[in-house]
Amino acid sequence: MPDAIEFEHEGRRNPNSAEAESAYSSIIAALDLQESDYAVISGHSRIVGAAALVYPDADAETLLAASLWTACLIVNDDRWDYVQEDGGRLAPGEWFDGVTEVVDTWRTAGPRLPDPFFELVRTTMSRLDAALGAEAADEIGHEIKRAITAMKWEGVWNEYTKKTSLATYLSFRRGYCTMDVQVVLDKWINGGRSFAALRDDPVRRAIDDVVVRFGCLSNDYYSWGREKKAVDKSNAVRILMDHAGYDESTALAHVRDDCVQAITDLDCIEESIKRSGHLGSHAQELLDYLACHRPLIYAAATWPTETNRYR
């Protein structure tokens, strides 16, 4: 386990985590997931604990929905990290098509798809809709489908990562690692609204860029120990080793430094918003938007040190 990423934000844990944990455990157990999938999202994985850091003020139902989404991510991630060990499960094309079908049809009683994971996705979408409303669920679903489109290209794209720069890698990593989905969840759960007035705002886009960069880099940093043993080539540490010629320890240190720099970048954006005189009413909206992502960064820096997933 590498050294923890330092982050001065004073994080809080959601007081509803025990209630959400109980409901989460019941739902996961009832889905009849494959044993390997169930193992990585139950018990010591502390999935609800992660969501409790990202969404410290969410009610129990919202925290549960967010936890189920995190479970979806982890199962999806492990399926492709260890695809060569897959015991006859769905091929990538079938998997991606199934997720897309669920996102498109979850509001109707569609046919039960062949992998229990799809019922986890269906349950997650239903819970997000109940907790956040139709507009939020539709936007989240749209971003999930965009992430699936990116994942379809990831397998081919990975063959070129020995030549690409870290900047180019990160520009696409945000798509297939679902950080764009996370940004949407943050604004609806922590921000409590769509922030529609900021949709085309360049400062909002700068905030998003920093948040997703930190999310991608911190995940790569903490997960390198397990990913280097698997077939996954999507990792900033590997990119730096291949492209820049760094040894493993130097590459890890660079990724960690880039995580710290991203936090500094976000602080600078926040300070510049406060000092700008031309933003008008958008200034407070931008500050609120930025603030809704702070817990995510805290969780991304902290949770990996608390779970057995990265050990």
Curated annotation (Swiss-Prot):
InterPro entries for this protein: Isoprenoid_synthase_dom_sf
Motif (DDXXD motif): 77-81
Thermal dependence: Optimum temperature is 50 degrees Celsius.
pH profile: Optimum pH is 6.8.
E.C. designation(s): 4.2.3.36
Record GO biological process: antibiotic biosynthetic process
Cofactor: Mg(2+)
Protein's UniProt keywords contain Cell cycle: no
Superkingdom classification of source: Bacteria
Enzyme class per UniProt: lyase
Protein family: Belongs to the terpene synthase family.
Task performed by this protein: Involved in the production of the isoprenoid antibiotic terpentecin. Converts terpentedienol diphosphate (TDP) into terpentetriene (TTE). Can also accept geranylgeranyl diphosphate (GGDP) and farnesyl diphosphate (FDP) as substrates.
Description of how the protein assembles with itself and partners: Homodimer.
Name by which UniProt lists this protein: Terpentetriene synthase
Species per Swiss-Prot/TrEMBL record: Kitasatospora griseola (Streptomyces griseolosporeus)
